[in-house]
């Protein structure tokens, strides 16, 4: 209790101290008058009573009637309007309590203004002249319809549509009984349409009724109930979009019945099989491109899909118009593509041709992909190259293309069949005759069998000189390959540069006479003709003519090489490689050069032939005896033709022998060139005569002539030389199976050509 009193006394003392501190001038000039008014500093007079506030722990002036009167006088609420500067702690509370009535005072006036606007909206409306697009038409026929009225008024402008119902804003007025009164209202989209209708439609007649057009004026007739008025469309964006749609330049829909969208899609079946894409997935792109090119002929393609997993091989093509799809169906239905007859039909709009991949198929595909990733880089490259080659083989332009209808394709097949039947008998006859001629020429001479037995085997299987392996004519294969590597290149170059046969013959003769080896030039010619022309009929004719020229040079070069070897020894190595003694001495040198040549198999045989001379002579004798018996049967058939050609060739041989003798005496090279050129011209003239006689079988006769010349030259060579054993020794037993194999291969090729 005592503590409370002390606290109260301390507060009182503090308040007195503050009052003394700020209230020193109470007795001075600022002292208020006896009326108790506060001084200029706003301090209360000394006679103001105070009371203790227990809650706030402070002294406050005691509120009495005098205090309230003074407070009101200070804040302008007195009757006389006098203001005072008295302030108090309760001023703020009193002011906030008095302010709300002041703010609420103007509310009744605002409410009245708002009420007035609403009343204005509920009344009649007025349309401005500039925005009035309505036209009132009177004098219409009583039997007119809404559609006819719309058609009439649309000639002068675009009629506005209702944004909610999307119907034209036109109206035909009716009387109480529901009959048309003969007047109507039309609302245009633009103001310019109103002026146009007034100018053109006014005073016009329809079915004898004269029309009158004016701008619509809206007047209130009777009582107007605003509650029944339709609500305004506040969706201005929808209204604006509809107006823009009416103002654009898109053509109107056709009056006829519109076709469905799914009629634009064409479904094509039996285009492929899903198994076709497993080996080469790129075939899918080729088929898609072929289909796009073909379907673009019928119209604009919007979308093209291939359902590669569908077992029926389905493809869908979407066109812009249904008419284009109809044209595509009419054209493609029943046609052939890639060996399959396809079907084309319109899509029903519901069938889904997409085939989803099963879980098992997905696992297999992922397993194959994982195996591909784990495979080494080399195998990947091989697979890529195989896929590329496969795609090239199955290109769209070669393997797959659209063919005509079945009737047309059958007619084409018949025409091609008749063409093949017409050509095949000619080819068979030519091939048969050339084969028979080759066999006959091989049996013309018995003495030549020992020397050219491997050559005959090759010629039996290869009368047309189509393969390099089956055309070794002599036993000197090693020396031939060596000479070819040294001097074969100029011969080839001369033949390729000059398209004429005579220039080729001269170049070949000159080379053969310089080197003293005709056999080498024959092999070169065989290889060159095979590389340049290939296994065709033209190459057969060229080879036969060239070989006949080479035999002439062969006869001369063989005799000259044997004689020059006796005189000069080892001085003319390159010119006398056809001789026997030089081959014995230079076996090792030839083997090294043979490794660089193209025919490595026959070159190895040449080295073995030198070592087995005696054994090979006996075996060649036996082989030649067997062949003589077989070839005697063919000798009689073409005896007449071969005799005539042999006479011509003997005359050529004599001229060549004279050229050889001149070469031994001096300036052998220059004279040999001149003689060979002269003889070659004679041979060319003789061949032109033969070509004129037998144009159809020119190829066969050239082959027969070739074989006769070779046999006669070899026969004469053996007559002049006593070294048959040595020459025959160059063809070893190992050449027999090789030649037989090559002849088998070539005979199979001939069969293929016949087919």
From Swiss-Prot:
Compositional bias annotation for Polar residues: 405-415
GO cellular component: nucleoplasm; nucleus; site of double-strand break; spliceosomal complex; U2 snRNP; U2-type spliceosomal complex
Modified residues (N6-acetyllysine): 297
Modified residues (Phosphothreonine): 633
Any Pfam family hit: RRM_1
Cross-link (Glycyl lysine isopeptide (Lys-Gly) (interchain with G-Cter in SUMO2)): 429-430
Composition bias, Acidic residues: 539-552, 564-579, 591-606, 613-633, 640-651, 675-713
Coiled coil start-end: none
InterPro entries with a match to the protein in the record: Nucleotide-bd_a/b_plait_sf (IPR012677), RBD_domain_sf (IPR035979), RRM_dom (IPR000504), TatSF1-like (IPR034393), TatSF1-like_RRM1 (IPR034392)
UniProt keyword Acetylation present: yes
Ranges for region Disordered: 1-53, 81-122, 380-415, 433-755
Modification type Phosphoserine: residues: 387, 403, 407, 409, 445, 452-453, 481, 485, 494, 498, 521, 529, 557, 561, 579, 597, 600, 607, 616, 624, 642, 676, 702, 713-714, 721, 748
Record's comment on post-translational modification: Phosphorylation at Ser-748 by CK2 during S-phase in response to DNA damage promotes interaction with TOPBP1 and double-strand break (DSB) repair via homologous recombination.
Composition skew (Basic and acidic residues), residue ranges: 90-122, 462-476, 508-538, 553-563, 580-590, 652-674, 714-725
SMART domains listed in its UniProt record: RRM
Residue numbers spanned by region Mediates interaction with the P-TEFb complex: 381-755
Comment block on domains: The RRM domains mediate interaction with U snRNPs. The RRM domains specifically bind poly-ADP-ribosylated RPA1.
Similarity-based family: Belongs to the HTATSF1 family.
Protein name, as recorded: 17S U2 SnRNP complex component HTATSF1
Gene: HTATSF1
């Amino acid at each position: 209790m005592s503590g409370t009193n002390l606290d109260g006394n301390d507060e009182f003392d503090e308040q007195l101290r503050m009052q003394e501190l700020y209230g020193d001038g109470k007795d001075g000039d600022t002292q208020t008058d006896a009326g108790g008014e506060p001084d200029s500093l706003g301090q209360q007079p000394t006679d103001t009573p105070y009371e203790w506030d227990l809650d706030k722990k402070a002294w406050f002036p005691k509120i009495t009637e005098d205090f309230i009167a003074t407070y009101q006088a200070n804040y302008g609420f007195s009757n006389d309007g006098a203001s005072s500067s008295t302030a108090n702690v309760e001023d703020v509370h009193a002011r906030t309590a008095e302010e709300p009535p002041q703010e609420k005072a103007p509310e009744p006036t605002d409410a009245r203004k708002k009420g007035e606007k609403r009343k204005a909206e509920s009344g009649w409306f007025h349309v401005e002249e500039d925005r009035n697009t309505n036209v009132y038409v009177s004098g219409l026929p009583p039997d007119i319809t809404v559609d006819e009225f719309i058609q009439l008024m649309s000639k002068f402008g675009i009629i506005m549509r209702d944004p909610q119902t999307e119907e034209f804003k036109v109206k035909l007025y009716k009387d109480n009984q529901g009959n048309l009164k003969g007047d109507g209202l039309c609302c245009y989209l633009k103001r310019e349409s109103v002026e146009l209708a007034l100018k053109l439609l006014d005073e016009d007649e329809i079915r004898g009724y004269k029309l009158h057009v004016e701008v619509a004026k809206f007047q209130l007739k009777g009582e107007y109930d605003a509650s029944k008025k339709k609500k305004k469309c506040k969706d201005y964006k929808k209204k604006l979009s509809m107006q823009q749609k009416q103002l654009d330049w898109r053509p109107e829909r056709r009056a006829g019945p519109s076709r469905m969208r799914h009629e634009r899609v064409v479904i094509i079946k039996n285009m492929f099989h899903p198994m076709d894409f497993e080996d080469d997935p790129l075939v899918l792109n080729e088929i898609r491109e072929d289909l796009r090119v073909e379907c673009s002929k019928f119209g604009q393609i919007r979308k093209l899909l291939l359902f590669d997993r569908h077992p029926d091989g389905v493809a869908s093509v979407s066109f812009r118009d249904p008419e284009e799809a109809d044209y595509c169906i009419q054209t493609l239905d029943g046609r052939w593509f890639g060996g399959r007859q396809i079907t084309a039909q319109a899509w029903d709009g519901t069938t889904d041709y997409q085939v989803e991949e099963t879980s098992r198929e997905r696992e297999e595909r992922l397993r194959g992909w994982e195996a591909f990733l784990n495979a080494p880089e080399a195998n990947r490259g091989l697979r890529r190259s195989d896929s590329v080659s496969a795609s090239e083989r199955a290109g769209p332009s070669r393997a797959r293309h659209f063919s005509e209808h079945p009737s047309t394709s059958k007619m084409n097949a018949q025409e091609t069949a008749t063409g093949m039947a017409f050509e095949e008998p000619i080819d068979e006859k030519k091939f048969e005759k050339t084969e028979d001629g080759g066999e006959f020429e091989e049996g013309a001479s018995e003495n030549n069998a020992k020397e050219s037995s491997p050559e005959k085997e090759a010629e039996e299987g290869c009368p047309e000189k189509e393969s390099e392996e089956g055309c070794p004519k002599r036993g000197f294969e090693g020396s031939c390959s060596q000479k070819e590597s040294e001097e074969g290149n100029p011969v080839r170059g001369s033949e390729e540069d000059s398209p004429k046969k005579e220039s080729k013959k001269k170049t070949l003769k000159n080379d053969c006479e310089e080197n003293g080896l005709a056999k080498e030039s024959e092999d070169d010619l065989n290889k060159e003709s095979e590389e340049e022309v290939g296994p065709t009929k033209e190459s057969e004719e060229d080879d036969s003519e060239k070989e006949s020229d080479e035999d002439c040079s062969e006869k001369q070069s063989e005799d000259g090489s044997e004689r020059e070897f006796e005189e000069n020894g080892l001085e003319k190595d390159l010119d006398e490689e056809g001789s026997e003694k030089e081959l014995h001495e230079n076996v090792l040198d030839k083997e090294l050069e043979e490794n660089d040549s193209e025919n490595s198999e026959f070159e190895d045989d040449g080295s073995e032939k030198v070592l087995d001379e005696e054994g090979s002579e006996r075996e060649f004798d036996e082989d030649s005896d067997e062949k003589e018996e077989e070839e005697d049967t063919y000798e009689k058939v073409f005896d007449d033709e071969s005799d005539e050609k042999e006479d011509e060739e003997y005359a050529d041989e004599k001229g060549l022998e004279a050229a050889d003798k001149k070469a031994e005496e001096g300036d052998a090279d220059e004279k040999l060139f001149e003689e060979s050129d002269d003889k070659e011209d004679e041979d060319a003239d003789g061949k032109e005569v033969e070509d004129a006689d037998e144009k159809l079988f020119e190829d066969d006769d050239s082959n027969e002539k070739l074989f006769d010349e070779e046999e006669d030259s070899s026969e004469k060579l053996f007559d002049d030389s006593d070294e048959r054993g040595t020459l025959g020794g160059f063809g070893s037993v190992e050449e027999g199976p090789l030649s037989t194999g090559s002849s088998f291969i070539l005979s199979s090729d001939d069969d293929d050509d016949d087919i």
